[in-house]
Amino acid sequence: MHIKLGDKVAIIAGKNRFVTDENGKKIIKTGKILKIFHKQQKVLVEGINIVFKHKAPLKDEDKGNIIKQEAPIHISNVALIDSLKNVPTRVGYRIENNKKVRYFKKSGTIIEDLN
């Protein structure tokens, strides 16, 4: 998988892609990966795809709540953000000095060593 836990990503597709500022300019939403669901190929991104969960009261004296929380989005809808250029970019893998490294395809800079 091209995304790792803690990576800063941009939303590149879907209803959560843009937010408009006060001037009407569209800004791509970004967030940090909180959790990865490998089998479903989904990720949980901080502050993205907020849904409301209705919680029923557990006891008679308790009240029910409406809780805001993040919902998972598909892995294909996110792209890693290049830290130097601050743009979403694809990620590749290559072998350098007998180590597998992850790198940005646009700039060619290495993200991390995997071994």
UniProtKB/Swiss-Prot annotation:
Gene3D superfamilies: 2.30.30.30. Belongs to the universal ribosomal protein uL24 family. The keyword Transferase does not apply. Keywords: Ribonucleoprotein, Ribosomal protein, RNA-binding, rRNA-binding. GO terms for cellular component: ribonucleoprotein complex; ribosome. It comes from the Bacteria. The gene is rplX. PANTHER family: MITOCHONDRIAL RIBOSOMAL PROTEIN L24. This is Large ribosomal subunit protein uL24. One of two assembly initiator proteins, it binds directly to the 5'-end of the 23S rRNA, where it nucleates assembly of the 50S subunit. One of the proteins that surrounds the polypeptide exit tunnel on the outside of the subunit. GO terms for molecular function: rRNA binding; structural constituent of ribosome. One of its GO terms (biological process) is translation. The keyword rRNA-binding applies. Coiled coil: none annotated. Part of the 50S ribosomal subunit. Pfam families: ribosomal_L24 (PF17136).
